[in-house]
Amino acid sequence: MKELLYMELAEVYHRLESTTKRLEKTEILAELLRSVDKELLPDVTILMLGRVFPIWSEEELGVGIKLLMKAISLVVGVSMDEIEDEIREQGDIGLASEKLFSRKTQTTFFSQPLTVEFVYSRLKALASASGDRAQSKKINILVEVLSQAKPLEARYITRTVLEELRVGVAEGIIRDAIARAFEVDPALVERAHMLTNDLGMVAAVAREEGEPGLGRLNLEPGRPVKPMLAQLASSIESAITELGRAFCETKYDGIRVQIHRCGDEVSIFTRRLENITAAVPEILEGVEEALPADDYIVEGEIIVTMDGRPASFQYILQRVRRKYDVDRLTREVPLSLFLFDVLYHRGPLIDEPLWHRREVLESILSEIPGRVEASRMVDVGPDNLDDALWLFKESIREGHEGIMIKDTEAPYIPGIRGKKMLKFKAEPETLDLIVVGGTYGRGKRAHLVGSYLLAVRDEKSGELKTIAHVATGLDDQTLQDLSERMENLKVERRGRKIRVKPEIILEVAYSEIVRSPEYESGYSLRFPVVKRIRDDLSPDDIDTLGRVISLFKQGFS
């Protein structure tokens, strides 16, 4: 296998970071992908996203900024305070590391140039470090890598460890680069990525097997895909008129899950592709009883019901977050599952129309009332519009969010928000935004982050762009919890201002979207209010600048 020096990769990162032009980034990446040895291609592709594992992998590096700073301190020979000062000065741990490493006087004897294979294997080893001495093991691994790093390499190694590469490359740019590098249809690359959620695999297949190989990639139980997403309907009547015929379903206020059976193993994934099987034993037991022993992928919503009504979304988060005391929580906060789609049963079904997929779901599901059921659904057309209106009113009366309105002829399109699936809610539309910073309070509230700086994702560049500050909608306990999380994610603090690794997602309601030069997005939200914390979403799931602009133009705001 032809070696690839990590410095060569770092220089590519630097070129990507130095341009804002999408086409230029695409060509830089295509050039790299063409030149990389086939054995390294999947790893390099994932590294270009600033990740070490595919998004659906259960493996995590488990390294926070404090642990990383400790390793830098040992390698460079400076204090933690000096590192914090440099991060504050540079505004980024990568740039701070580069500056500190450029002043390093110690040299590792007999050090060899870092290779991508070595760096990648040692970063993966971080996820395997466990037990009583896990933190020490992780520090030793980081020191082993960083002690051989040159300043530019240190910039990108440290950013990769925190999964915050900051070179303006998103999945769309990498898909385009794969298509250009190996001269294959971009639509085939996009579809292959939607069905595998593994750009490393897609790149390898595109190179070795071309378009025929990409066409053969398909759904596989055990490997989750991003869910099909819904647009907001302005009214039930207009949605039914546009679709002609639709399945209308109760919109449950819970956590959307994808359940996979592969052989004897059943896995339950959230919308952010996180495996929560161990946290929801009653759901696992229920689906094993209610569904056949065939391989399948089904989709549904997990909710909590208390006193006959849906309970707060936060109760569900409490369940799926906990790794301990699961038996007690299972008794105190019991869960129910409502299934509404099947993506795979004895073969992929996503290209089949919804009406057929629903028939398959109902044929394989043996409902267990109160535990595992099919979603409540009515078949609606222009002639029986009243049935949809009845379902909406009934769903709201029972404490649910509203209804889903789905085109009966639509295939399942993973990861796409389109007009084949619509939602109509009693409450105004909201945005899912990511926290990038905040401001601490004063006086008795000086220990709490009282105002949160929010951002959307620019889908063209992949960058986060600020759009609002929000300071209302959170009770004191939630503020305390969020402030502790912010401190753990801290990248920089200056006075009362804090900047954090973008990880916390808030669902925010607002009265209006307006143009504003104050924020990087060019837009702002009037009277924003936090509706809930969205720990069921990943940073890739947040709303985009394109959606904000669309809402602004349509006047939904």
Curated annotation (Swiss-Prot):
It holds the Pfam family DNA_ligase_A_M. InterPro entries: ATP-dep_DNA_ligase, DNA_ligae_ATP-dep_bac/arc, DNA_ligase_ATP-dep, DNA_ligase_ATP-dep_C, DNA_ligase_ATP-dep_cent, DNA_ligase_ATP-dep_CS, DNA_ligase_ATP-dep_N, DNA_ligase_N_sf. Its cofactor is Mg(2+). SUPFAM superfamilies: ATP-dependent DNA ligase DNA-binding domain (SSF117018), DNA ligase/mRNA capping enzyme, catalytic domain (SSF56091), Nucleic acid-binding proteins (SSF50249). It catalyses: ATP + (deoxyribonucleotide)n-3'-hydroxyl + 5'-phospho-(deoxyribonucleotide)m = (deoxyribonucleotide)n+m + AMP + diphosphate. It is an enzyme of class 6 (ligase). ATP binds at E249, R256, R271, E301, F340, R417, K423. Signal peptide: none annotated. The active site is at K251 (n6-amp-lysine intermediate). Keywords: ATP-binding, Cell cycle, Cell division, DNA damage, DNA recombination, DNA repair, DNA replication, Ligase, Magnesium, Metal-binding, Nucleotide-binding. One of its GO terms (biological process) is cell division. GO terms for molecular function: ATP binding; DNA binding; DNA ligase (ATP) activity; metal ion binding. Its EC number is 6.5.1.1. CDD domains: Adenylation_DNA_ligase_Arch_LigB (cd07901), OBF_DNA_ligase_Arch_LigB (cd07972). The keyword rRNA processing does not apply. HAMAP family: DNA_ligase (MF_00407). Belongs to the ATP-dependent DNA ligase family. DNA ligase that seals nicks in double-stranded DNA during DNA replication, DNA recombination and DNA repair. This is DNA ligase.
